[in-house]
Amino acid sequence: MAQQEVYLGNPNLKKANVSQNFTKKQVAEYLKCAENPIYFIQKYIKIVSLDEGIIPFKMYDFQESMVEKFHKHRFNIAKLPRQSGKSTIVTAYLLWYVLFNDNVNVAILANKAPTAREMLGRLQLSYENLPRWLQQGILGWNKGSLELENGSKILASSTSASAVRGMSFNVIFLDEFAFVPNHIADQFFSSVYPTISSGKNTKVIIISTPHGMNMFYKLWHDAERGQNEYVPTEVCLLYTSDAADDVRG
C-alpha cells in the first residue's frame, strides 16, 4: 500500500477516502461476508497466540452458536467460564457489525476501563490483519475508540453511566457484568439502558463469569425462566492447554 494511502504511517491500515478497486471474486466475497458473520469470522478473523503468534480464529461450535444468537436476537446474556473465548467471539462479531453497517455506534464496556481497552485492542489487531479490500478507511484510531469512514464507531470504557451519557448506541457489549458493583450496575441500567432498549434494531450483549448475587444473577435467572427478553446461553466446558484464554480470549 502506498504511503499516501495508509493511516498515520501504519501499512496495515487504509486511510479514509482512498479508492478501492475490486475484482469480481472480491465483490462476491465481500457480499458473502456482509451477509454472514460466521463466514466472515471463520475466514478472515485472526488472533494472537502466545505460542504461535498471529493465527486464524478457529471457532468452537458453541461460539458459532453464540454468533448466530447475536445476529438473530436483540438481547443476549451468556454465562461462561474463564478461558472460553467469550470476549474474543464478541469482539469478532462487533468488528463484522461495524464493517458492514453504516453509521452505527458500538460500546465495549467492562468492569474496568483497561479491560475494555484491551478488548478493543484485540479487535483492532484483527482489523489490521484483514485484506485491504475488506477494510473501511480509518478516521480515528486510538486505545479507547475506533472510527471508520462508513460513519461507524466503537468506544471502549468502563461500565458506568457517566462513560456513555449523552451518546446513542446501536450495540452495547457488557463484559464481566457480574463483577460490576451493584450501585454502578443499577445506575447504568436506569440511565443508559432505556435509550438502547427503546430502539427497534439495537442490541445488548451481556457476558460474564458468575460472581455472586447481583444484577447479572437476576437478569440471567429471569432469562432462564422466560421472564425478560434476553436469550440465555450457558457454556460449561473444561479446556485443555491448547485452548487457553491467551489463545481464544
Task: Give the ranges of each region predicted by the language model.
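Phosphate/NTP-binding elements of NTP-utilizing enzymes
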Residues: 2-241, 248
